[in-house]
Regions:
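Sec-dependent N-terminal signal peptides
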Residues: 1-31
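Intrinsic-disorder/low-complexity detector
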Residues: 6, 29-30, 52-60, 64-260
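Short N-terminal segments immediately surrounding and downstream of signal-peptide cleavage
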Residues: 32-49
């Protein structure tokens, strides 16, 4: 889940208003006139309340402090470890199916993907004693907003860099998958790939929710697959043994806006 910052609104109520509504006023007493500053404070508070309501309706994540972020991160890692174990079993079934279909190029590619995923899983299992106090992500306030569907989320530079990585990793994997299907003379279908359905390669369980990483990985994958299967370079290029999505395409996918 993306990170937001706690915005506490403190409204100063004038002494006259407290006396009038909180303590009661004798019948022969007259409440003091409201000052201009007091009226402005009430107006600001009303605007802040309306803004919070709009943000909630827009689907903005609830704000969290640093300790809450750490607790969420620990829970996220635990759930991710379990998910990766389940994905290993799914991958074994997919590999057996590829062998039955004699899709040799796709089978080799998937085995390579699984080997990298297993290495990633080992690294995540070693995060039990992770020192969150030394990770600047947890003390860096949000500075960017990104949109997904009808919701928007806030994160800092570390989160944006991870989402950018997701798109590029997805493009590279999609490019290779498209090439493999073409070599196997198999019908074009990027959704049939385990890597597309898994979409976890490169995700270490930190900074952004897995659903967000998966979403942007698949966005890159789909475009990479189209380039690979069609033997073209519409969305990216292949240099130094790796596929990289074009900057303009990447920017249109991420749709990131600076907020401060």
């Amino acid at each position: 889940m993306p990170v937001t910052v706690v915005n506490r609104i403190v409204v100063t109520i004038g002494i006259g208003a407290v006396v009038l509504f909180g303590l009661g006023v004798p019948t022969n007493a007259q409440p003091p006139p409201q000052h201009g500053q007091e009226q402005q404070d009430k107006k600001d508070a009303k605007q802040q309340k309306a803004q919070k309501k709009q943000e909630k309706q827009a689907g903005r994540e609830a704000p969290h402090d640093q300790q809450t972020l750490v607790r969420q991160q620990q829970q996220r890692l635990a759930q991710y470890r379990e998910h990766l174990e389940q994905q290993q079993r799914v991958a074994e079934q997919q590999s057996a199916q590829l062998e039955r279909q004699h899709r040799r190029a796709q089978y080799r590619l998937q085995q390579h993907y699984l080997a990298r995923l297993q290495q990633q899983q080992l690294r995540i299992q070693g995060q039990a004693d992770y020192d969150y106090s030394r990770d600047p992500y947890f003390s860096t306030p949000p500075s960017y907003r990104y949109f997904r569907g009808d919701r928007y989320y806030e994160t800092n530079q570390y989160g944006v860099d991870l989402l950018r990585q997701a798109v590029n990793y997805g493009y590279d994997e999609g490019l290779r998958t498209g090439l493999a299907d073409r070599q196997d003379r198999w019908e074009s279908n990027y959704r049939d790939s385990f890597a597309y359905r898994d979409a976890n390669y490169g995700y270490g369980g930190f900074y952004v929710d897995r659903d967000d990483y998966n979403n942007y990985f698949r966005e890159g994958f789909r475009r990479g697959y189209e380039d690979g299967y069609g033997d073209r370079s519409q969305y990216g290029r292949f240099t130094d043994g790796r596929g990289t999505i074009l900057d303009a395409v990447l920017a249109s996918i991420l749709n990131v806006q600076a907020i401060r």
